[in-house]
């Protein structure tokens, strides 16, 4: 990372490890429940972790800053933009933001699945060119990574079904696994961001990836590696990046206050390449209570969730307009994300 920073690459590091660091530092006097353990270990471990990063980067003359966040901070546009502004100012002043979930006060029901989910949100929020997810294996395999016959899938195009390949095993101390990594990678790539899953245990992996595989994006990155055959999985980004607002909405499903159920015709139109809004005429049911600007899920005529959007009116107004012609959109196209 120091080499990339010196080459002019702006870096945001999303790092876990606070709980594990704290666990090795302190031994509770009595048995604690899971919530108390997480809060205690993360409080102690985060101080140890950020201090270690501070010392390591100081050896290279690089300042770092700590950013602790929670899932709720992505729920409203105001908090979302406030976080973005904080990290933008840090990057503009040569500071590497080191981001982690604030486990000391996060509510279990609203915690990130793991830091892969958090990294996807950060990459999307900051309009990153590349999201690199480092794991303990070389990428997405076409079988079990433990099977010698399995090979890494090097490129993943849009719409490719990977469900039969993904293993459910988790990394040590982590809350999520390869399924989470794949889901996040696909969503972020659909937003126009290059996503790479690679082995973080490989020496110089970051420099080699950017120098050998993405030279057009990072021409100033130099690598001394002789082996050009890197093994990793590359998620091909959508050719047209989505707007900043749509990126926020795309990751807001967990904060949805209600549901809009739409008919067969509306479902088909939304699945096309047309820029269309959700009109009352195509709505068959409005569930939940929400206000204007709240996030709502979009449910197709078969009951499948197909997207999320920002409501242009309250649930009461949506019910009054439901099924009628000539009414304003309940969700405008500019604030609609279809998966």
Question: How should these model regions be labeled?
Answer:
Residues 1-30, 35-63, 67-339:
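C-terminal catalytic "cap/lid" subdomain
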């Amino acid at each position: 990372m120091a080499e990339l920073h010196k080459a002019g690459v702006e870096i945001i590091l999303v790092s876990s490890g606070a709980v594990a660091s704290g666990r090795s530092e302190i031994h509770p006097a009595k048995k604690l429940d899971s919530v108390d353990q997480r809060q205690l270990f993360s409080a102690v471990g985060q101080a140890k972790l950020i201090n270690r990063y501070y010392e390591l980067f100081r050896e290279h003359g690089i300042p770092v800053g700590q950013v602790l966040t929670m899932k709720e901070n992505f729920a409203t546009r105001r908090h979302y933009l406030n976080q973005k502004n904080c990290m933008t100012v840090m990057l503009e002043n040569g500071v590497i933001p080191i981001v982690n979930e604030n486990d000391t006060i996060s509510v279990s029901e609203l915690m990130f699945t793991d830091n892969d989910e958090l990294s996807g949100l950060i990459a999307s929020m900051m309009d990153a060119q590349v999201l690199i997810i480092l794991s303990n294996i070389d990428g997405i395999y076409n079988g079990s990574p433990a099977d010698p016959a399995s090979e890494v899938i090097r490129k993943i195009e849009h719409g490719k079904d990977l469900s039969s390949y993904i293993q459910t095993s988790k990394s040590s101390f982590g809350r999520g696994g390869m399924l989470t990594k794949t889901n996040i990678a696909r969503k972020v790539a659909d937003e126009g961001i290059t996503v790479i899953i690679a082995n973080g245990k490989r020496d110089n992996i970051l420099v080699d990836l950017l120098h050998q595989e993405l030279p057009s994006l990072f021409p100033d990155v130099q690598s001394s590696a002789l082996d050009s055959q890197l093994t990793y999985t590359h998620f091909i980004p959508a050719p047209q990046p989505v707007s900043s607002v749509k990126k926020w909405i795309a990751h807001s499903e967990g904060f949805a206050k209600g549901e809009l159920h739409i008919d067969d015709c509306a479902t088909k139109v939304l699945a096309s390449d047309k820029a269309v809004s959700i009109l009352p005429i195509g709505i068959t049911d409005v569930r939940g209570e929400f206000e204007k600007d709240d996030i709502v899920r979009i449910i197709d005529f078969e009951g499948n969730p197909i997207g999320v959007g920002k409501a242009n009116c309250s649930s009461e107004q949506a019910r009054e307009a439901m099924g009628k012609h000539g009414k304003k959109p309940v969700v405008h196209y500019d604030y609609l994300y279809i998966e």
